[in-house]
Amino acid sequence: MIHFRLLLTTALLTLCLSHTKAKIDIVPIPEKMEYGNGHYQFGTSIRIGYTDLSLKPASEYLGNHLTQLLGRKVITVYNNKGNVRLSLDKNLPKDGYRLTIDKTGIDIRGNNYCGVISAIATIRQMSFKTQLPYIHITDAPHFEWRGFMLDCSRHFFSKAEVKELIDLMALYKLNRFHWHLTDDQGWRVEIKRYPLLTSKGSWRKYNDQDRVCLQRAIQEDNPDLLLPASKKRVEGTDTLNGGYYTQSDVREVVAYAKQRGIEIVPEVDMPGHFLSAVSNYPGLSCFDTVGWGKTFSSPICPGKDSALEFCRNVWKELFDLFPYEYVHIGGDEVEKINWKKCPDCQHRIAEKGLKNEEELQSWFIHQMENYFNANGKKMIGWDEITEGGLSKTATVTWWRTWAPNVVKDVTAQGNDVIYCPNAEMYIDYPEQKASVRKIYEYNLLPPGLTPSQKSHVKGVQANLWTEWVPTRNRMLYMYFPRMIALAELSWSRPERMDYVDFSRRLLYQFNILNRMEIPYRIPEIDGFHNVAAFVKQGTLKVTCADPTAIVRYTIDGSFPTVKSPQFANPITVDETTHFILRPFGKNGRAGEIVKADFVKQGYLEPVSIQEDLKSGLKADWYEFSGVTCKHIGKAPFNASYQVDDVRIPTNVKGNIGLIITGYIKVPTDDIYTFALLSDDGSWLKIDGNMVVNQDREQSPHEEVCQQALKAGFHKFEVRYFDHNGGQLRLNVYGQDGERLHPSDIYFCTK
């Protein structure tokens, strides 16, 4: 049960203000912040005065917070007389605020309602019981759009869980909640005209995603990956998983977010990702049989007028639930094979003078956008809506990092864009040691954009897809601390940002999250590789960015518990040893399991080279739709390329199976480090020995392993597969930590 512990945000904070100028480690960092000498202490009664009726909800929001914080009665009044005063000041920057705490109390002035709410967020983060430091803050956001997306289709999150997330967004001045309400795996919002969408479409038998969660819960000793009993129901002999929001639920969540200055943007993904609709209402798809095609699911049929009418009717009900200007149509990852075979689609293409199925998708998107505009709404879509022609009024969420020209092209046309590049902003990807920093230091206004183009960058959001996120705890674990980095990236100006200082302030935020019982991800334990090679002796060293974390370990294959040995000092081994490590919070909450294999090796002997060599590697591309590296060579051969590094060759896309071969030449007898990043699977073999093994479906992940090599040439093979976009990169380092340049080490037969 959610206890709405977020209303108690600072009630539980007991960090001591030991002197009058103690720093308040606010995130996002304010534009200007000046400390005074002294503290303001609340009396026995608290009065919040507001000078504009539009601020009444904000006064009640703050009043509820202070009541929980201080255990005293708080009165809100429509005047400017009170310990706390809320007012509007149109001279402040848009959405900006000015906060002053002095002997008279707390004075909050905002350019608008959202500015006042942002000042309240600052107060929520300040550590106090009954006193606050004298301080003067002036602040305003850098970007208009500061958002998060939650996918409630793959796994369902209750109304209370969504409200908890929204309250956390408000704590960090985020102002756009992108609510992904429908997808193939579940329809999550009541549409009264089409009741089967929720009575059937919101419930499913366990699918592959559910089974992976259950399997990982065991493999990783993690109960947060188990499917919640509250989201199950039994029908006959079947156990179903799911749930949905009534229209009353949606109105309640929208009102809750509005009070906290957050706009909700609903997404009903179409024409693809629509299986939960087309499987329950026959006639929406091209053919009676629906399911999965070569890559994605059966889409809606844009050749049928009745299908378009269905979509309009769905959105008509949603318009009444969401009062804001933007709605999101999705528009990504559409399987067009059915459209090529469908008489209705082909008739539509001919009738409208379209060239192909890409333009048919664009025609469908434009039809829906016209309907949105006629109802006073503006359309947002994933960047695939640019294919086949983009309207002049659509806003694009750019997510495909392998389509880097989208931002430049869209903004050059005069359209707005919202950044959410998957490599950095997809927080369903496992967090690694550089993840927070990559978000924090992401450049939203790159030099290649003109001033006019930069004006069309609305901001940024991070997306949480929930195929493998079944619970509230796992959701919050994936959001934090990355949400905090995104908050500062989107709010603060670059000249105020510094990652070292942010890292210091992040420790203070961990204390807040601990007090609020938010199960954030304990930072990466570091200092070692996935596989560490040694010839005589190896030494395990461990560090953690959270100084309150306790690291425990085992060497017998069991998972560490609170009773396992605590890592205190470096551990030296002279035989192969398999460490399993796990950080624990002060309250005993377990973090993520990490494995470190210390492997005793002899140096691999170099091979004798008989043929003439040239710089580079050979990359063979196979039309591979499988999910294991060992079968790539059995797939149909497409083409061969020469590459100068381990990477995906230009023009290789779709179903990708790569076998990259050649030789690696190392200069000295040494232990070399290989950092292989891939999305999806990959492996690296040297002289036939497996060095890095990521032979699995995965989001972007870097595995770092070592191998002892004698100087000279060694046979080299990288295998890689992916089916939509993908990433592949290999960096090689010597024992001194210096990266070896690809042109110096890679060779292949002439």
Predicted regions and their residues:
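Active-site neighborhood of glycoside hydrolase catalytic domains
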Residues: 277-282, 288-393, 400-409
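Feature activates predominantly on carbohydrate-active enzymes
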Residues: 92-299, 304-308, 316-326, 367, ...
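Short, compositionally stereotyped local motifs that mark structural "simplifiers"
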Residues: 493, 497, 501-620, 625-665, ...
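Short beta-strand-plus-loop segments that form exposed binding edges in beta-rich domains
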Residues: 717-726
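Contiguous, structured surface segment used for ligand recognition
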Residues: 22-145, 474, 490-500, 508-512, ...
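Bacterial Sec-dependent N-terminal signal peptides
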Residues: 1-25
